[in-house]
């Protein structure tokens, strides 16, 4: 089961590289430690232990296939299971649209009751409930993607895992900076696009004021500044990972305030749609 556990982590983490909600806060109770955890004793291809047919993993997901962040996880998980010869029905328990409240704990426990040896959650707000379940079920490996408390918890069966998504946000900022430079050098910006200090205004739609969101928009901002130094950034939070209307309205407000670039760390296309509509209307 060590190989199964590690590869499921790898594919899920690779999937996260392409989406917007994530944490850079992986700690020592992360993929490498999880893969080598002595408590994980089953095997997948010979020797003593259980076979693939006996392996079952639970996936407690904050959204479903209609939401980009969770969809990327689903694609990664199904790819991993296919590579390992696992059946996405027989070897998995799926929990969709699980909010960041006590129902997350209930969903994890139900996965355990159905025979899961490892359970993954995929949202920062799931973390405390995942830790609670790990404390009560030491025989089960529980992975919180994202998160930052596994190391401090001291629990050998509780892990955090995620990609360093802030690196991708820095690259996105570099691309945004190139566009800003093009617009500024070409004289295509109006007075409303500059603040009182002569900085070009940019905006950012964030889900929550969590460390992972702050690190993401900081990386984005630094990426922009690496290309075009004179910028200022306004951040608006929606207090939700997935709120199409809220994200759209936040982006509209930023555009109305003169922001020429809008980044985001949330799960829907709301902000992007607002930018597309503004461009089509010729307002930005």
Task: Show where each model-derived region lies.
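A residue-level marker of the well-folded mature domains of exported/periplasmic proteins
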Residues: 27-284
């Amino acid at each position: 089961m060590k190989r199964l556990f590690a590869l499921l982590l790898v594919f899920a983490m690779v999937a996260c590289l392409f989406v917007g909600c994530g944490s850079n806060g992986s700690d020592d109770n992360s993929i490498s430690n999880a893969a080598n955890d002595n408590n994980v004793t089953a095997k997948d291809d010979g020797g003593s232990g259980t076979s693939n047919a006996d392996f079952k993993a639970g996936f407690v997901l904050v959204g479903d296939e209609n939401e980009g962040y969770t969809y990327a996880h689903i694609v990664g998980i199904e790819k991993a299971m296919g590579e390992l010869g696992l059946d996405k029905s027989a070897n998995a328990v799926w929990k969709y649209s699980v909010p960041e409240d006590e129902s997350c704990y209930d969903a994890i426990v139900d996965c355990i009751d159905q025979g899961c040896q490892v359970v993954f959650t995929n949202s920062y707000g799931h973390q405390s409930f995942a830790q609670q379940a790990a404390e009560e079920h030491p025989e089960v490996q529980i992975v919180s993607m994202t998160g930052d408390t596994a190391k401090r918890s001291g629990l050998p069966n509780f892990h955090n895992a995620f990609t360093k998504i802030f690196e991708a946000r820095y690259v996105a900022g570099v691309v945004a900076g190139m566009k800003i430079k093009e617009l500024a050098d070409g004289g295509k910006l109006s007075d409303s696009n500059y603040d009182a200090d002569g900085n070009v205004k940019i905006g950012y739609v964030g889900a929550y004021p969590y460390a992972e969101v702050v690190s993401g928009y900081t990386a984005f901002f630094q990426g922009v500044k690496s290309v075009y130094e004179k910028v200022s950034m306004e951040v608006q939070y929606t207090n939700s990972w997935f709120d199409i209307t809220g994200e759209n309205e936040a982006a509209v407000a930023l555009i109305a305030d003169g922001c020429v670039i809008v980044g985001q760390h949330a799960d829907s296309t709301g902000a992007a749609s607002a930018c597309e509509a503004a461009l089509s209307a010729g307002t930005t």
